[in-house]
C-alpha cells in the first residue's frame, strides 16, 4: 500500500469536533461540534488545501452527527443535536455570485437527544433514519424530494422495552445499508447490542438479525458497500476496545417469497424473526487497546478505518476469505506507520 500522508485542517471550532464527513464526490467536507456550529469546507485544486466556505449555528446544544444527502437531491445536509432536533439544510443561491445554507426543515419528534442519523441510498427515495436516547428509531421521508420543507414521519420503532435510566450513559447508532438493488436494511447499535432491521412489503420495519459478542456500549456501526458480492459486511466500534466485523448472508429468496405470499394468513411478525439472516463474526480486533469510537469502510468495502481513544486511525484491509489485517496506523503525534 502507498504511504499515507496526514494533513491538519484548522477548523477553528471552539469545542470538541463530534463528526466529520465527506460529500458523495469527496470534494467537500463538513464538520459539526459541541460548540453548536457546522462548518463546510471545499477543496482547492490549486493550493491542494481545504478552506472553510460556510459556517453557521445549527442547534441549541452540542451537535452530534452530520450527514450529506445524495447529490441528486441537491446540496443537502442533516444535523442532529442533543437538543432533540434534526435539522435539514439546503445550499441555495443567495445572488448570482454566492450561495448560502438555509434551514428548510426541523424534525422535533424525539423525546430525548438525537445521537445519530443516516440517509438511505437515493434509489429508495429521500429518507433519513434518526436514532435517539429515548431508545427509538425514526424513519423520515421527503415525499417530494424537490421540496425538502416537508418530511413525513413514516416509522417509529422502539429499540428497547424502556429507555436507559438517567444513571446510564446512552449509546445508540444507526447506518443504512448502501445496497441499491436489494431489500432495505438498517443496522442499529442499541447500548451493548446490535441489530439488523428489514423493511417488508407493507413498509414496516422488523428485527431480522442480531450481531452478537459485544460486552460494552457500541459507539458506531457501518455497512460495507457490497460491490456485487452475495453477502454483506458490517463493522462495529465498541467501548470494550474491539473492532468487530460480521459477515451477513441472506437466506433463500424463495422462502421469503413464500412467506410474503402467505402474509394474509400470518401474524405481522411472522415473516421477520432472528433467523432471516445468517450472521457470522469473522473478525475481532483489540489493537486500539482502548475505547473505539468510529468505524467506516471505503467505497469498495475492502478497507476499514477505525479511530479510538488512543488518538490513532487504524486502517484494516481485507485479504483472502475476508480476513482483515491492520495495514497502517495514522497518528497526529507522529508519522503514519506502515505495517
Swiss-Prot record:
WD repeats: 12-51, 58-99, 109-150, 166-209, 213-256, 287-326
Broad class of where this protein is predominantly found: cytoplasm
Keywords assigned: Cytoplasm, mRNA transport, Nuclear pore complex, Nucleus, Protein transport, Repeat, Translocation, Transport, WD repeat
MF GO annotations: structural molecule activity
One Pfam family here: WD40
GO cellular component terms listed in the entry, alphabetical order: cytosol; GATOR2 complex; nuclear periphery; nuclear pore; nuclear pore outer ring; nucleus; Seh1-associated complex; vacuolar membrane
SMART domains, A to Z: WD40
GO BP annotation list: cellular response to amino acid starvation; mRNA transport; positive regulation of TORC1 signaling; protein transport
Localization in the cell: Cytoplasm; Nucleus, Nuclear pore complex
Domain of life: Eukaryota
Protein role: Functions as a component of the nuclear pore complex (NPC). NPC components, collectively referred to as nucleoporins (NUPs), can play the role of both NPC structural components and of docking or interaction partners for transiently associated nuclear transport factors. Active directional transport is assured by both, a Phe-Gly (FG) repeat affinity gradient for these transport factors across the NPC and a transport cofactor concentration gradient across the nuclear envelope.
Homology family: Belongs to the WD repeat SEC13 family.
Oligomeric form and interacting partners: Component of the nuclear pore complex (NPC). NPC constitutes the exclusive means of nucleocytoplasmic transport. NPCs allow the passive diffusion of ions and small molecules and the active, nuclear transport receptor-mediated bidirectional transport of macromolecules such as proteins, RNAs, ribonucleoparticles (RNPs), and ribosomal subunits across the nuclear envelope. Due to its 8-fold rotational symmetry, all subunits are present with 8 copies or multiples thereof. Component of the npc107-120 complex which consists of nup85, nup107, nup120, nup131, nup132 and seh1.
Protein name: Nucleoporin seh1
Species for this entry: Schizosaccharomyces pombe (strain 972 / ATCC 24843) (Fission yeast)
Amino acid at each position: 500500500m502507498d504511504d499515507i500522508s496526514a494533513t491538519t485542517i484548522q477548523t477553528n471550532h471552539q469545542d470538541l469536533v463530534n463528526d466529520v464527513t465527506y460529500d458523495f464526490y469527496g470534494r467537500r467536507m463538513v464538520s459539526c461540534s459541541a460548540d453548536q456550529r457546522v462548518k463546510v469546507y471545499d477543496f482547492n485544486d490549486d493550493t491542494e488545501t481545504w478552506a472553510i466556505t460556510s459556517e453557521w449555528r445549527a442547534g441549541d446544544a452540542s451537535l452530534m452527527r452530520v450527514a450529506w444527502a445524495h447529490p441528486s437531491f441537491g446540496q443537502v445536509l442533516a444535523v442532529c443535536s442533543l437538543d432533540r432536533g434534526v435539522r435539514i439544510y439546503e445550499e441555495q443561491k443567495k445572488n448570482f455570485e454566492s450561495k448560502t445554507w438555509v434551514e428548510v426543515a426541523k424534525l422535533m419528534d424525539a423525546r430525548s437527544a438525537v445521537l445519530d442519523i443516516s440517509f438511505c441510498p437515493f434509489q429508495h427515495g429521500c429518507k433519513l433514519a434518526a436514532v435517539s436516547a429515548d431508545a427509538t428509531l425514526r424513519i423520515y421521508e421527503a415525499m417530494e424530494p424537490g421540496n425538502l420543507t416537508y418530511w413525513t414521519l413514516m416509522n417509529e420503532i422502539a429499540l428497547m422495552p424502556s429507555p436507559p435510566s438517567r444513571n446510564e450513559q446512552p449509546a445508540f447508532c444507526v447506518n443504512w445499508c448502501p445496497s441499491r438493488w436489494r431489500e432495505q436494511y438498517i443496522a442499529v447499535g442499541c447500548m451493548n447490542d446490535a441489530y439488523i432491521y428489514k423493511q417488508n412489503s407493507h413498509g414496516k420495519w422488523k428485527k431480522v438479525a442480531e450481531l452478537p459478542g459485544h460486552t460494552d456500549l457500541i459507539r458506531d456501526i457501518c455497512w460495507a458497500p457490497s460491490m456485487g458480492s452475495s453477502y454483506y459486511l458490517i463493522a462495529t466500534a465498541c467501548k470494550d476496545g474491539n473492532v468487530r466485523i460480521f459477515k451477513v448472508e441472506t437466506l433463500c429468496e424463495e422462502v421469503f417469497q413464500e412467506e410474503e405470499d402467505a402474509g394474509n394468513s400470518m401474524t405481522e411478525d411472522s415473516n421477520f424473526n432472528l433467523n432471516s439472516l445468517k450472521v457470522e463474526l469473522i473478525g475481532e480486533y483489540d489493537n486500539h487497546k482502548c475505547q473505539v469510537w468510529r468505524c467506516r469502510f471505503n467505497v469498495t468495502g475492502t478497507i476499514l478505518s477505525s479511530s479510538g481513544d488512543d488518538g490513532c486511525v487504524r486502517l484494516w484491509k481485507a485479504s483472502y476469505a475476508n480476513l482483515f489485517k491492520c495495514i497502517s496506523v495514522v497518528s497526529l503525534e507522529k508519522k503514519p506507520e506502515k505495517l
